[in-house]
Amino acid sequence: MFESVYNLPEQIQKAYEIGKNISVNVKAEDIDKVVITGLGGSAIGGNLLRVFVLDKCKIPVIVNRDYVLPAYVDSKTLVIASSYSGNTEETLSAYQDAKAKGAKIIAITTGGKLKEFAEKDGFDVITIPSGLQPRAALGYSFIPLLMLFVKLGLIEPVDDQIEETVKVLSDLRERYKPEVPEEKNLAKRLTLKLWNKLPIIYGISGTTEVIAERWKGQICENSKSPAYFNVFSELNHNEIVGTESPKHILGLFEIVMLHDTEDHKRNAIRMDITKDLIKGVVSGVNDIYSIGNSRLARMFSLIYLGDYVSLYLATLYQNDPTPVKKIDILKNKLAEIKD
């Protein structure tokens, strides 16, 4: 897993090359909404895309994480079925639902039943390289979708942003890699603060919300320890009140607040006020800021730090970050149960 994380800049570059060669039959004038259906690591790519194009794409982009699709899916809907393995049962079910509803479908996968079904049914397939854990293939599950939106004319070209992202991540890995000592390594310093604590990751709606979710997922899957996330300003309308009792539990909370230059000004203010309200109640509050000029580079700079933190936590807990045994057991048990 360390190798996969280290190689993310190269993965993004390869994913960009895949994206440049995408050719699909779908036309922008034939669709009025996009639904990206997937789970886990595959869904994160779609959710990142949703946030990235939020103020750029003129049609709705929705992420679906279920066996079925919403009732509004119809012949004017582009359904992107994303499953790294190609065998995710919820995604396969949603694919069949999309087909039944007459939607336009594009699959993004390494193979499996999803590729088999899509090719048999005459739908476009974006094939990405196999051999990784889905969560380690974020570049492959996100960048081709981004390039697809460019090809369809739904957003402006992003070539310069991808180039900067590769450069920023290449620089950051030289700061975060295992050989760099703690005093010069932000990833290691933050990991030590989260170790033997309960990490709570806070993002901001429209900018870092999905990145906070990614941090949570990476900590859970890689370090095999619990983590949670929430989003401003919603958490100011409920969760903030739950910081009075029980004090012995709250004292284990280590908060990470993710900041970006495009955060809504009022949400940035909310973050500062919230920090003052919970200091002294929780174990600590850590402010983490994005790096880079373009939106894409800044997003991935935060993602990359979270990836490294999750791996260093796994090391401290003496857990192998790669296997996800409980997910495998769950899938096997589900496979034994027929409807």
Swiss-Prot record:
Keyword Isomerase: yes
Catalysed transformations (reactions): alpha-D-glucose 6-phosphate = beta-D-fructose 6-phosphate; D-mannose 6-phosphate = D-fructose 6-phosphate
Residues binding D-fructose 6-phosphate: G41, S42, S83, S85, T88, R135, H237, K331
A Pfam entry, by short name: bact-PGI_C
A biological process from GO: carbohydrate derivative metabolic process
Protein EC: 5.3.1.8, 5.3.1.9
Superkingdom of the source species: Bacteria
Catalytic site: E221 (proton acceptor), H237 (proton donor), K331 (proton acceptor)
UniProt-listed InterPro entries: Glu6P/Mann6P_isomerase_C, SIS_dom, SIS_dom_sf, SIS_PGI/PMI_1
Keyword tags: Carbohydrate metabolism, Isomerase
Domain SIS: 22-164
MF (Gene Ontology): carbohydrate derivative binding; glucose-6-phosphate isomerase activity; mannose-6-phosphate isomerase activity
Subunit composition and interactions: Homodimer.
Family: Belongs to the PGI/PMI family.
Function: Dual specificity isomerase that catalyzes the isomerization of both glucose-6-phosphate and mannose-6-phosphate to fructose-6-phosphate.
Name of protein: Bifunctional phosphoglucose/phosphomannose isomerase
Biological source species: Caldicellulosiruptor bescii (strain ATCC BAA-1888 / DSM 6725 / KCTC 15123 / Z-1320) (Anaerocellum thermophilum)
Organism placement in taxonomy: Bacteria, Bacillati, Bacillota, Bacillota incertae sedis, Caldicellulosiruptorales
